[in-house]
């Protein structure tokens, strides 16, 4: 499965990607098999997609969220509800993810809105080691962090514009079931497609 694990929709204040546009572009104009919708502090984009009836059975959409933690951003994959409040503590984020059965990814840890030094000890299942919106040095530091913590590294486009979807992606050795995908990520069965990024 080739998946972009970090994509925003118009339900993130800093993105204008509409739901119809997102699905049409992602499933027809990229080589992706799926995406994770990771809107800021909301799963409304995923909800609207499901309610709309717009569907492509051959294209997987993973319900996810990008939590705006006071010290940085955290991705949680495979969730069906939003947290009851914003600005959660570390313990609340972990509890929320566990209750949902979600996978915690430390997003762009060394970018301006990443966890930075806190990332060294923040509980997570994987680390985003390639993000085109981060500098090469920030991505290198994230990769070293994943290696030192013995955590899988993943890529995410962090797309806020339609043409950025799939700029980087992940080949995940799994079926098209979300549970299999999150399990494979935890087990490190991920190969990054870096496009023009290293």
Please place each PLM-identified region on the residue numbering.
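A short beta-strand/loop micro-motif in the catalytic core of glycosyltransferases
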Residues: 35-36
């Amino acid at each position: 499965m080739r998946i972009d694990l970090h994509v925003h929709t118009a339900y993130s204040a800093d993105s204008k990607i509409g739901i119809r546009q997102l699905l049409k572009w992602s499933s027809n104009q990229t080589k992706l098999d799926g995406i994770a919708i990771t809107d800021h502090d909301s799963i409304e984009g995923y909800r609207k997609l499901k309610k709309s009836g717009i569907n492509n059975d051959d294209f997987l959409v993973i319900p996810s969220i990008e939590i705006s933690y006071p010290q940085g951003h955290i991705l949680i994959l495979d969730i069906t509800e939003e947290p009851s409040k914003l600005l959660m503590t570390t313990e609340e984020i972990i509890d929320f993810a566990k209750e949902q059965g979600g996978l915690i990814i430390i997003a762009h840890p060394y970018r301006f809105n990443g966890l930075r030094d806190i990332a060294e000890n923040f509980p997570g299942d994987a680390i985003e080691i390639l993000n085109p919106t981060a500098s090469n040095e920030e991505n290198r530091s994230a990769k070293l962090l994943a290696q030192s913590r013995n955590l899988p590294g993943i890529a995410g486009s962090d797309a806020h514009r339609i043409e950025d979807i799939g700029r980087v992606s992940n080949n995940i050795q799994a079926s098209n079931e979300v549970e299999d995908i999150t399990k494979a990520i935890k087990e490190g069965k991920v190969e990054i497609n870096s496009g023009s990024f290293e």
